[in-house]
Regions:
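Generic recognition of short, well-ordered alpha-helical interface segments
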Residues: 86, 149-152, 246-249
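Alpha-helical transmembrane segments and their immediate juxtamembrane interface regions
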Residues: 92-105, 212-237
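Transmembrane helix-loop junctions and nearby membrane-interface residues
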Residues: 22-29, 56-64, 88, 94, ...
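N-terminal low-complexity or simple alpha-helical regulatory segments
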Residues: 1-118, 133, 137
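Membrane-proximal linker segments that couple transmembrane helices to downstream signaling/catalytic modules
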Residues: 224-256
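Alpha-helical transmembrane segments of multi-pass integral membrane proteins
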Residues: 32-54, 108-109, 134-216
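Alpha-helical transmembrane segments and their membrane-interface exit regions
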Residues: 80-87, 144-148, 214-221
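Short alpha-helix boundary/capping motifs
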Residues: 119-120, 185
Length: 256
């Protein structure tokens, strides 16, 4: 792939990511107490998309043939870890708002940034051969992070289904939240595929960045559609409805 073609394709794909993030930031959300954490989740998702788009544009200034490519891999691993944290918390807050607090998010972010800072320090201070061992260890930690977030999501999803089962039929719950499961599993697949970016291969970079742009556009659409399911999810989560109401239309009428 020629330098000019690579540059153009990466700029287009990265520009689409930035545009998706900006459009998501402009989406209006209900201005009420129940939607407060939904707005926070939207901000987290917006930040994750913009973070990747801007990083890909900045990465174009790196020399892929020089030693600085290792620094690019460090930053790519850091971006992937932060994105995994943001996406997971954005999904979790929609099914278990009490599990996502500012303190927990900052704690997770602090641990991720500490590990990434140590990795960059190893790149600067240690011989290249030694640094590569540290880098491989950080890749293993990243995979462990994805496994941990998957376990967290599955546990809270089971709790959520048990919590709302008193209010709605199982089919209605599954139909309303099907997209949320798709969102998480696609995000997990993206997190795994992000490891391919560490190969520093131009063709892989272009293909994966284009795929990420499509996936994140899908994420944004799903996230916007969540507002249609909010009458189902939020009242049950916050226990604002005292009597069991097993019909979405009846519940909506009750809340209005």
């Amino acid at each position: 792939m020629t330098d000019e073609l690579y540059l153009r394709m990466m700029l287009v794909a990265s520009g689409c990511l930035v545009l998706t993030g900006l459009l998501l930031a402009l989406v209006r959300t209900p201005n009420n107490e129940l939607a407060a954490k939904f707005r926070g989740a939207k901000h987290a998702l917006t930040l994750a998309v913009l973070l990747l788009g801007v990083f890909n544009i900045v990465q174009l200034s790196f020399d892929p043939e020089g030693d600085v490519r290792h620094l690019g891999s460090c930053i790519a691993l850091a971006i992937s870890s932060v994105q995994a944290m943001l996406f997971t918390n954005a999904v979790i807050v929609l099914i278990s708002p009490s599990e996502v607090t500012l303190r927990r998010v900052l704690w997770q972010l602090g641990v991720i940034l500490l590990v990434d800072t140590l990795l960059v320090g190893a790149y600067i201070l240690l011989p290249l051969d030694t640094y590569l061992y540290v880098y491989e260890l950080c890749v293993i930690l990243y995979i462990a992070l994805l496994v941990g977030y998957t376990h967290w999501y599955m546990r809270l999803r089971r709790q959520f289904l048990a919590q709302v089962s008193a209010y709605y039929e199982e089919e209605e719950i599954e139909r309303s939240l099907r997209w949320l499961g798709i969102l998480f599993w696609v995000a997990l697949a993206v997190g795994v595929l992000s490891l391919l970016m560490l190969l520093a291969n131009r063709t892989v970079d272009v293909c994966l960045t284009a795929l990420l742009a499509l996936c994140y556009a899908f994420f944004a659409a799903c996230f916007v559609n969540y507002q249609l399911s909010m009458p189902l999810v939020l009242p049950a989560l916050y226990q604002r409805v005292t009597p069991p109401v097993r019909n979405l239309r009846a519940l909506t009428a009750l809340l209005s």
